[in-house]
Amino acid sequence: MLIINGKIIPIAHTICAFSAFFAALVTGYSLHFHKIVTNAHYTYPDEWFPSVSATIGDRYPERSIFQILIALTAFPRFLLLLGHYYLNQSKVCFLVGVLRTVSCGGWVYITSTDDHDIHDIFMITYIVLTLPWDIMITRYSSPLTSKNKGLTATIFFGTLFPMIYWYIQHSVQQRAGAYSIYAYFEWSLILLDIAFDAFAYADFKKIDIVLAFNEKPGNTSFFQIRDSSPINYGEEKSSELQKSGEKKVEKEKPVARSATGSYFRFDSFFYLLTNIFNGFLFWSNVTSLLCSIWHFPLWYMGISGYEAAILGYLGPIFLYLPFVSEAFTQYGVLLGGIIAIGAYIVQMPELRLISVAVGTSITVATFVQNLRYITNAETSFSFALTWLLGLVASVILKMGFYTNNPTWVILDERNGGYNKTALVLTVLFGMLSPYVNSINFEGKRNAQAKSASLIGKLFLAVGFGSLLFGIHQLLTDSSTTIYWAWEGYNESHGPLPWPWGALTCTVMLFASLSSVKFMGKPLVPCLLLLISTAVLSARSITQWPKYIFGGLLYAIAMLWLVPSYFSALGQVQNIWVYVLSFSVYIIFVLAHVWVVAYAFVPMGWVLREKIETVLAFSSTFIIIGALTCKNLNIQLVTMGKKFFIYVFFFAVALLSLTARFVYDIRPTGIPQPYHPDSQLITAGIWTIHFGLDNDMWASEDRMINLIKDMELDVVGLLETDTQRITMGNRDLTSKLAHDLNMYADFGPGPNKHTWGCVLLSKFPIVNSTHHLLPSPVGELAPAIHATLQTYNDTLVDVFVFHSGQEEDEEDRRLQSNYMAKLMGNTTRPAILLSYLVVDPGEGNYNTYVSETSGMHDIDPSDDDRWCEYILYRGLRRTGYARVARGTITDTELQVGKFQVLSEQALVEHSDSMYEYGHMSEPEYEDMKFPDKFLGEGERGHFYHVFDEPRYYL
């Protein structure tokens, strides 16, 4: 019989693994230094340190030395897995370890030189699996080693952020030396990973490997691990933490009650107020993160790498780490709020995004930490109601701030943010929260509640993740469901955000208050959800019916289901259930993006233009989860009179705030054109990149200033569909139309799968129709055809149009034919404000400017155009200017001045209106563009290309 102490396993693993990487590095440095530090962009001396991939996989003999030594690591590696399994008895942990080991073999033996994509897939898989592996191993470790492992794991994942940053600097910015700095962090991950497994030494000393013959003749065993009994440090530690937590609560309860009596009960004023704010903070941070992420793929025109910040929603996974759950219980609201809201101080967009991701991660984890311990029925409903009222408060506040949340990091004091006020409130309620919410951790699991099966937990997790997505997609702004129903102006057009956004807020408030009636009774809400989803998915149902029976009914059904979910989740305390919920939420968010961004993402065709499918799946999962909740819910709740008195007070406060905001954002008067004496229409076209400027700040105020300065009567805005999760569910027309005192038509809605277009007009919009142009391959091209009532009741047609991508030639050909026919079908004077992606005088240009369309170019001699074009017909062209964008967006503002003529004047001018001949000064002073943008201009705006405006006879 041979007995070997288990400590030899981590020792052998550490020696073999470290030797493999170290030997390859030394050999590579000695033989091929210049070759292994060379990358796609730079070589020595700009780069001076090799990446792991270049070191282990590019050259002989270091590649062979590495692979031999790493092969020797396999035996102690699998012994390490078996030893951990014996100690913690966790099959899930063992399975993750095996998959992690296989993925390690993938990126080790398939190098980046062999197949770059496969190598990266295995590498990413390995890093992703390292998270649950480190957490579970740390959780199940003895107290002696858990701190060391926890610290090592924390440093490991903290190192990922600067590593990703420097990789982007290398691959996207092509910055010299960036790859060497990236390599430092990459090698640090290797050392930290080896060190983490080395800390198993203390745990493995407690076991022996026994090699012996079996007592039965003829039978032998390869080996067995012998010990008196399995040691489950995780259970011991969990028990200790739970006991210490119970003691802590017991200590705090008398202190709180002696100081404030019953103020800290579930029906107390302070409990309700604090958790309404916490609910508001939750939704503010959750919506802020995705709104910030969107800036990066937008400006990189593709996947940038910063999208990984979406993993911040998986904050609950950190509750597995020792002492983290207790820390978040005490300081989660405070830390999460300060970091996420305070991120506005950070000027660099990349670092601001990381700050928001960290803060949101803590906020989400703190929410989960509270929710998973609430087992009392009354406390559960009180917590659910305050969470809903926090949601309603955020929606009302967004309505009052023109659909921007004033706590978001895309705002500061310069563009309407109230970040400092939010920080003060966060500190106040963050300090109150651990005391007020101590009641959430009281009580035991109700004896009447049924234990959930694994399948039940899965359904509950998937349902809750879908519920979060559904609320975020349609119910985080008062105008989202309105725009799902909007089809343009006509005699019986649908609701507009003002004043009907207030109805959305009121219905959401009603649904929140009445949700107590449906706690544990999901059948009616599920039926309403089924009906409303069908209405929202039906493209034939539009305007008021879609808003009422789709949008409002959906809001009622969703909010009625929340208390049932909260009650059931309180009976299921497993952290993985919540991690799975937010994973499902992330998957649905990506699907929500894929339906529009299919041309820019892998496998985009799968979900192309299928928002209804995404909605249907989410509603189906919500219903299945809700029916599962029914089996887990405890007895009916009975809330006292005092509770409803306080709730009534908060409801009245929210209704009053709604009324105040409706009054504040009312139209300021009847819009009037700037130059009625000359009967001028000053029209512009501008691509505004979804209202986010180059530095990730909301740009509405700066856009308003330029539009005012240029005295635009009509403006077409492109890339405006911000009524999506990733754009913050914002309505750019809300503030623009209000502050500019203009009518607004929000083009094809968020359920039409376009990037959006908007028409703002000083003239009444008599009629407007929305068009989706042929796009068999690329992105959908949106268009608005609006008829404006101008001077002397002369009707003028305005077309706002965004064509497809440069790569999709057939799409653009079909779209040009469609637009030419659409413009040619009307004989009224017309203006096209467009984004055509064509050279002047070439290709599809000759379809837009043709006998079929009847349209003419505002200046055929301007040959420095590709994207934006202004065409016209039946109007007298008097001026044309191109204005630099500043840092608002990536595209200039083009402006044309046109004079509306009487029928007699039209006959007199006839074809002379289209003759070319420009001047440096206008015919009349009233027709002049502002001088402030001559020369260097103001605020980064100046006349460019011609360096001054052009005027025409």
Swiss-Prot record:
Similarity comment text for this entry = In the N-terminal section; belongs to the PGAP2 family.
Instruction: List, alphabetically, the PANTHER family matched.
Output: CALCOFLUOR WHITE HYPERSENSITIVE PROTEIN PRECURSOR, PGAP2-INTERACTING PROTEIN
User: What's the superkingdom here?
Assistant: Eukaryota
Note the effect listed for D713A.
Answer: Impairs the introduction of ceramides into the GPI anchor
Provide the residue span(s) of the region labelled PGAP2-like: 1-229
Which Gene3D superfamilies does the record cross-reference, listed alphabetically? Answer: Endonuclease/exonuclease/phosphatase (3.60.10.10)
The GO annotation for biological process reads: cell wall organization; fungal-type cell wall organization; GPI anchor biosynthetic process; GPI anchor metabolic process
Q: What is the effect of changing R882A?
A: Abrogates the introduction of ceramides into the GPI anchor
Q: Tell me the residue ranges located in the Cytoplasmic compartment per UniProt.
A: 1-7, 86-91, 139-149, 197-278, 329-330, 369-380, 442-450, 517, 569-585, 635-642
The listed outcome for D693A is:
No effect on introduction of ceramides into the GPI anchor
Q: InterPro entries attached here?
A: Endo/exonu/phosph_ase_sf, Frag1/DRAM/Sfk1, GPI-anchor_lipid_remodeler, PGAP2IP_TM_1nd, PGAP2IP_TM_2nd
Q: Where is this region: Required for function in lipid remodeling?
A: 862-882
Keywords in alphabetical order, please: Cell membrane, Endoplasmic reticulum, Glycoprotein, GPI-anchor biosynthesis, Membrane, Transmembrane, Transmembrane helix
| Protein's recorded name | Protein CWH43
On whether Transmembrane is a keyword of this UniProt record, the answer is: yes
How does the entry describe the domains? The PGAP2-like region interacts with the PGAP2IP-like region.
The disulfide bridges present are none
One GO cellular component term noted in the UniProt record for this chain: plasma membrane
Q: Write down the membrane topology.
A: Multi-pass membrane protein
Q: Which organism is this protein's natural source?
A: Saccharomyces cerevisiae (strain ATCC 204508 / S288c) (Baker's yeast)
Residue ranges that the UniProt entry lists as topological domain Extracellular: 29-64, 113-117, 171-175, 300-307, 352, 402-420, 472-495, 539-547, 607-613, 664-953
Q: What is its main location?
A: membrane
